[in-house]
Amino acid sequence: QGAVLDVYDVERVEVLRGPQGTLYGRNTIGGAIKYVTRGLSDEPTFEANVKVGSYSQIDGTLTTSLPVTDSFRVGAAIASFNRDGFGENRITGEENYNKELFGARVSAELDLAENFQLRAAADYSLDKSNARQGHRLIPDQFPPFTYPVLGDVFDTRAGLNAVDQRVEAYGGSLVAEWDLNDNWTIKNILAYREDESTSPIDFDSLPEADVDVPAIYENDQFSEELQFLYSGDRLNGLIGVYYLDANASTVFDVLLATTGDLLSLPGLNAQTFGDVGTETWSIFGDFTYDLTDRWSLSLGGRY
């Protein structure tokens, strides 16, 4: 939740193929996508981008960077992404597959010395796009639910509207980087994130209140990572330690009103509560040695 959002204020995107667990830990067996945010400029900068398209699409971003002193810089970015829906919910009248997102980010860099820098950043995002409800590809076979297939694949008959679709996420980070000498650098990354979301999930995509799931999700996580980086003529790499404390809470109903009526159990539903806490730590290292200009040998491990 809170992860599938448009990306802005990014310098580059790195697609890392294959297992990346040595450096990035859990859930990276198939690879990782790394977003590198744009650093702050020593010169005043301002950039504006606007994109327009069909379905009344208007996307806009504003980014700015300002050097306050020779050693202190601040920056900010805001973004808005809006588009009408491709389809329509024939029951509620809402647009289906629309987009309504807002995001903002502020950052600051402070050079405490020529070889020591602090970087702080905070971000906020809000997604109020309607829930993307499903489209049935075959008609129902059981009366009285003989609904014909809709002509537009983007249209839906989902009737659940107990909660609105809403995803709100925010977080911050503090990075300290100390260049000890030409070869060694110490880097510390402190971060916190939190998100809250509500989502109406209509599994049968029909107006009847059956297999309808209004869901609420809340997540937060704190992480700390300390790295010792080495850069030499042929050998490059790092060793580090990592700690994560995360919590995830979920509350959702499975509304089974139609099934309950058939079973003489009016108002049948199954309510589920979930609360998961995760605390994890690791030590890791990864080094690459250049054998020639074309060949290199990498060795890494994580515990």
What are these regions (language model features)?
Residues 1-17:
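Short acidic/polar hinge/loop motifs at secondary-structure boundaries
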Residues 48-52, 76-82, 120-124, 190-192, ...:
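Transmembrane beta-barrel strands of outer-membrane/channel proteins
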Residues 71, 93, 99-238, 244-247:
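Outer-membrane beta-barrel domain signature, strongest for Gram-negative TonB-dependent receptors
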Residues 17, 37-39, 230:
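Flexible glycine-/small-residue-rich
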Residues 90-96, 108, 243-303:
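Signature of Gram-negative outer-membrane beta-barrel scaffolds
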Residues 15-16, 44-47, 86-92, 152-160, ...:
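Extracytoplasmic loops and strand-loop junctions of Gram-negative outer membrane beta-barrel proteins
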Residues 7-11, 22-89, 94-104, 112-116, ...:
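Outer-membrane beta-barrel translocator/receptor signature
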Residues 12, 32, 47-49, 59-61, ...:
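Membrane-embedded beta-strand positions in outer-membrane beta-barrel channels/transporters
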